[in-house]
């Protein structure tokens, strides 16, 4: 009986550790996903950049929609500084029909996304990263050819009202990296809609 309890506890601990997700300082998981233009985009495509702003987002979530223009602005303001945005839709479109590839393509065209919008069809990427909400940001830093997590969490400190933002977490983290410092804070709580997963 004690053995069974111990085995169950150990299995639970392993599952919890596997689901803990990436933390600042961890190596980022490589990915290769289909963009709305039909081409595959890989993390390795950005090996010449200083970093990548990976944003797990989606179509219907009110929080994701509230952040849409801010995500576009991040790309426009920081892509030329070596930190482009890569957006990834992690939702299972059988559960969230607004997140089909066709709907993603439609939205990207309508909103004029200047960055890739990728579909995590198998949902392996968001699970590997540990994303829980949309939007959920993983700011990656290129460390000698290896992408490491420099910051993870929210874009800023006011999800629904941009005019009331007082702290821009992602921008501050990028500025810290550009000045040779470590982001502080390096993690915050991502506020948004829970990712829709079949499992």
Where do the language-model regions lie?
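N-terminal "domain-start" segment that seeds a small globular fold
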Residues: 18-44
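Structural microenvironment flanking redox-active thiols in thiol-disulfide oxidoreductases
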Residues: 65-110, 121-128
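Thiol-/selenol-based redox modules, centered on thioredoxin-like
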Residues: 139-199
């Amino acid at each position: 009986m004690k053995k069974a309890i111990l085995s169950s506890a150990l299995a639970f601990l392993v599952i919890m550790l596997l689901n803990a997700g990436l933390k600042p300082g961890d190596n980022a998981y490589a990915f290769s996903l289909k963009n709305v233009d039909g081409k595959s985009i890989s993390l390795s495509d950005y090996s010449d950049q200083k970093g990548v702003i990976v944003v797990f987002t989606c179509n219907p979530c009110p929080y994701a929609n509230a952040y849409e223009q801010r995500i576009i602005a991040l790309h426009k303001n920081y892509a030329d500084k070596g930190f482009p945005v890569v957006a990834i839709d992690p939702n299972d479109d059988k559960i969230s029909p607004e997140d089909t590839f066709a709907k993603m393509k439609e939205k990207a065209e309508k909103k004029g996304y200047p960055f890739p919008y990728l579909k995590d069809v198998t949902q392996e990427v968001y699970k590997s990263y540990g994303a829980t909400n949309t939007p959920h940001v993983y700011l990656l830093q290129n460390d000698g050819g290896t992408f490491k997590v420099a910051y993870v969490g929210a874009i800023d400190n006011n999800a629904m009202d941009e005019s009331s933002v007082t702290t821009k977490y992602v921008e501050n983290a990028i500025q810290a990296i550009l000045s040779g410092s470590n982001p502080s804070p390096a993690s915050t709580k991502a506020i948004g809609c829970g990712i829709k997963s079949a499992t």
